[in-house]
Curated annotation (Swiss-Prot):
Cleavable signal peptide: none
Lineage of the organism: Bacteria, Bacillati, Actinomycetota, Actinomycetes, Mycobacteriales
Top enzyme class: isomerase
Role: Catalyzes the reversible isomerization of glucose-6-phosphate to fructose-6-phosphate.
Active-site residues annotated for this sequence: E352 (proton donor), H383, K509
BP terms from Gene Ontology: gluconeogenesis; glucose 6-phosphate metabolic process; glycolytic process
Name of this chain's protein: Glucose-6-phosphate isomerase 2
HAMAP family: G6P_isomerase
Entry keyword annotation includes Transport: no
Pathway: Carbohydrate biosynthesis; gluconeogenesis; Carbohydrate degradation; glycolysis; D-glyceraldehyde 3-phosphate and glycerone phosphate from D-glucose: step 2/4
Example of a GO MF term: carbohydrate derivative binding
Length: 551
């Protein structure tokens, strides 16, 4: 039976404490504890994390850490790092941390030398990367590869696409494009200006049977063979998969298969062979730096006491707002345009992991779980949705991400200052205004007409974290990824759920396969068991000019 922490006296104590804190404004918290902006910070590797603008006291943080400890975060953390089968519903180890482990580390799990296997694949990836980047690997007509197209979906797309966008200044290899959606527009728009002779496809699918991925891969194969012939397939396709039989049947040679393992889920796989396209783009040395950034946070998470452990603190703040305040969402706002896809990446990482309503033992959870992650880069969001963050009725904690040193910069209008400084001033201003706001007296003191005062009041007391890195590099990107990965783990342990399965995505897949014939089998009946779906199919078929066998 799962240890149900929500039924413990400690949970009750936190619930009672919440009612003591909920009526206290952040202005008051800073007035009574002026050093909190110095003390309520934590550093992890190259990241400076300020959590002082949260609706917590020092007592709150002590209780949250006590809750993490009581839930068994330390014990389960060690179980994860050492290969225990903590993914209980699938009876699997959870070893994404092994993907970035030092090669000298020994880890035997289920009779396999996990770290040795990882570095064998990394070496093969590096050798292949060097061949593509140097021009030693060429297409069927002898042309050098100029574009790599990554075909995958979910973790086989979101992580690599995010990392490629984030690290664009470090790209000195072939251009990489990403195709994920089964909508033909995705593949066709990416192929329209490409030359088959200079294009290499990386097909990423653990089973090599994922519907969307294999539909796109098959279409890409036709594109190659129609232009270059069947013999060209082995020179224009490689695979990231565990199913050699299916891959070789597709026409890819076995030596061009890069494997990964059941113990790494898709949303945790960007540091595995699923990141091959990123390695080709930035080179094996920078990819190693990327893995090193993840490893630095792994080591911080594994060895740092809970009281100063960044993933524990941030994960428990998420529990605080979700389970005690009833907050549904967290906004992640990177003030770095190259991190534009980072919120979308976090959506899968966090919501597929912790969007669960039963505990590991199958019993219903007793609290809200999971957070809805969303966001856009600053300052764009300030002209879109920040209005709701500042004056809306929803409580939405915010994570601000920023960097001290820009990779590229421009002068201000007067030619004196730095536009990056202006960007960062906006980041700090948003954090400050969310926390402290502007009350009616302050608005009126500006000469605002009395009728307009209520409209201009900013209530403040809106919580946020600010995470600052020195510069956006492969290492700091890896650090950010691991920082959020381990937050997910901490929350899952406290809520008693399995953060590493995703059964909720399966029924939709099977239902789509069942419904498909009603759309394209024009001699079959369109009725599928309920009037709504039947009506949608009928409307769809009529719009496509097909009237046979309609109810």
């Amino acid at each position: 039976m799962t240890h149900i922490v929500t039924d413990t006296p400690l949970w009750k104590k936190l619930s009672d404490h919440h009612w003591e804190v909920v009526g206290t404004h952040l202005r008051e918290l800073f007035d009574t504890d002026p050093d909190r902006g110095v003390d309520l910070i934590v550093t992890a590797a190259d990241l400076y994390i300020d959590y002082s603008k949260h609706r917590v006291t020092r007592e709150t943080m002590g209780l949250l850490v006590d809750l993490a400890r009581a839930a068994g975060v330390e014990r389960h953390r060690e179980a994860m790092f050492t290969g225990a089968h903590i993914n209980t519903s699938e009876d699997r180890a959870v070893l994404h941390t092994a993907l970035r482990a030092n090669p000298e580390r020994e880890l035997i799990v289920d009779g396999q030398d996990v770290v040795g296997d990882v570095h064998t694949v990394l070496r093969r990836m590096g050798e292949f990367t060097d061949r593509v980047r140097s021009g030693a690997w060429r297409g069927a007509t002898g042309e050098r590869i100029r574009t790599v197209v990554n075909i995958g979906i979910g973790g086989s797309d979101l992580g690599p696409a995010m990392a490629y966008r984030a690290l664009r200044h470090y790209v000195d290899g072939p251009e990489v494009r990403f195709v994920s959606n089964i909508d033909p527009a995705d593949l066709l728009s990416n192929l329209t200006d490409l030359d088959p002779r200079t294009t290499l496809f990386v097909v990423v699918s653990k089973t090599f049977s994922t519907l969307e991925t294999m539909t796109n891969a098959s279409a890409a194969r036709r594109w190659i063979t129609e232009a270059l012939g069947e013999h060209a397939v082995p020179r224009h396709f490689v695979a990231v998969s565990t199913d050699e039989e299916r891959v070789t049947a597709f026409g890819i040679t076995a030596r061009n298969i890069f494997g990964f393992w059941e113990w790494v889920g898709g949303r945790y796989s960007v540091g595995s062979a699923a990141g091959l396209s990123v390695m080709i783009a930035i080179g094996r040395e920078r990819f190693t730096e990327f893995l090193g950034g993840m490893r630095a946070i792994d080591e911080h998470f594994r060895t740092t006491p809970l009281e100063s452990n960044a993933p524990v603190i941030l994960g428990m703040l998420g529990v605080w707002y979700s389970s005690f305040f009833g907050a549904d969402a967290r906004a992640v706002l990177p003030y770095a345009h190259d991190l534009a896809r980072f919120p979308a990446y976090l959506q899968q990482l966090t919501m597929e992991s912790n969007g669960k309503s039963v505990r590991t033992d199958g019993t219903p959870v007793g609290t809200f779980t999971g957070e809805i992650f969303w966001g856009e880069p600053g300052t764009n969001g300030q002209h879109a949705f920040h209005q709701l963050l500042h004056q809306g009725t929803h409580l939405i904690p915010v994570d601000f991400l920023g960097f001290a040193e820009p990779i590229e910069d421009l002068p201000t209008l007067d030619g004196i200052g730095s536009v990056h400084d202006v960007l960062t001033a906006n980041l700090f201003a948003q954090s400050k205004v969310l926390a402290f706001g502007k009350n009616a007296d302050e608005v009126a003191a500006d000469g605002t007409p009395s009728a307009l005062v209520p409209h201009k009041v900013m209530s403040g007391n809106r919580p946020s974290t600010t995470i600052l890195g020195a510069k956006l590099t492969p290492s700091t990107l890896g650090q950010l990824i691991a920082l959020y990965e381990h937050q997910v783990f901490v929350q899952g342990i406290v809520w008693g759920i399995d953060s590493f399965d995703q059964w909720g995505v399966e029924l939709g897949k099977t239902s789509a396969l069942e419904l498909g014939p009603a759309l394209w089998d024009l001699d079959g009946a369109a009725y599928v068991g309920d009037s709504s779906t039947t009506g949608l199919i009928r409307t769809y078929r009529l719009a496509r000019g097909e009237r046979r066998c309609l109810p």
